Amino acid sequence: MTLTMAMPKGRIFEEAVQLLRSAGYNLPSSFEQSRKLIIDVPNESLRFILAKPMDVPTYVEHGVADVGVAGKDVMLEEKRDVHEVLDLNISACHLAVAALPTYQRGELNPKVASKYPNVASQFFKEQGEQVEIIKLNGSIELAPIMGLAGRIVDIVSTGQTLKENGLVELEQIRKITSRFIVNPASYRMRAGEIHDMVERLATVIEGDGSEDH
């Protein structure tokens, strides 16, 4: 019986595919170049669904996919009913607050732009600061430049995008990596297959970790 895995398009997908290959899964060499949204790998009894990163936990929660790979940022924002069973330790980055270098705290009606409104709202609430959150779907760096918001909350990996747009990081909210997530019903019904996959991936991750020391 085929196990369905939801994957985010982009960098996480490429790193997750490498991880699966390292764990012994025989995936076609043309796999990463495929433009299909559903890719079947019959020899491994696997089916891959390629979705927008924010949508991966939704596919897993509703059982359309048995398992998936999602960034911790997406997990925190979406709060879906899925089991987060393994830190894959790929696509490392962090969530941060950023602004123009001229930004000064204490403005009236402070506004923060983000594609992570729930994460941003929670963070500022914990800081005891009341802000208006403006949800954007991309190019978050535009918000301070155009005067839409004084600060942004966004993912930072190298910091190059912030730098190119003249922004500076004010504070780090938390570190982010990608996680292996499982549909609760699939976890019960297909425990053997899923545990096998988790163990194989964990062995590779632990091996990579030990090489770093």
UniProtKB/Swiss-Prot annotation:
Q: Which Pfam families match?
A: HisG
Compartments (UniProt record)? Cytoplasm
Record's catalysed reaction(s): 1-(5-phospho-beta-D-ribosyl)-ATP + diphosphate = 5-phospho-alpha-D-ribose 1-diphosphate + ATP
Q: What GO cellular component term, any one, is given?
A: cytoplasm
Q: What is its main location?
A: cytoplasm
Against PROSITE patterns, the record matches this protein to: ATP_P_PHORIBOSYLTR
Keywords per UniProt: Amino-acid biosynthesis, ATP-binding, Cytoplasm, Glycosyltransferase, Histidine biosynthesis, Nucleotide-binding, Transferase
Q: Which Gene Ontology molecular-function terms are recorded?
A: ATP binding; ATP phosphoribosyltransferase activity
InterPro entries the record matches = ATP_PRibTrfase_cat, ATP_PRibTrfase_CS, ATP_PRibTrfase_HisG, ATP_PRibTrfase_HisG_short
EC number(s) stated in the UniProt entry for this protein: 2.4.2.17
Question: Record keywords: Glycoprotein included?
Answer: no
Whether ATP-binding counts among this entry's keywords is yes
Q: What processes in GO biological process is this protein linked to?
A: L-histidine biosynthetic process
Specify the pathway.
Answer: Amino-acid biosynthesis; L-histidine biosynthesis; L-histidine from 5-phospho-alpha-D-ribose 1-diphosphate: step 1/9
What the entry says about domains is: Lacks the C-terminal regulatory region which is replaced by HisZ.
Q: How does it assemble?
A: Heteromultimer composed of HisG and HisZ subunits.
PANTHER family, per the entry: ATP PHOSPHORIBOSYLTRANSFERASE, ATP PHOSPHORIBOSYLTRANSFERASE ATP-PRTASE
Could you say which protein family the record assigns here? Belongs to the ATP phosphoribosyltransferase family. Short subfamily.
According to its UniProt entry, the function of this protein is described as: Catalyzes the condensation of ATP and 5-phosphoribose 1-diphosphate to form N'-(5'-phosphoribosyl)-ATP (PR-ATP). Has a crucial role in the pathway because the rate of histidine biosynthesis seems to be controlled primarily by regulation of HisG enzymatic activity.
> What is this protein's record name?
ATP phosphoribosyltransferase
Organism, by scientific name, is Shouchella clausii (strain KSM-K16) (Alkalihalobacillus clausii)
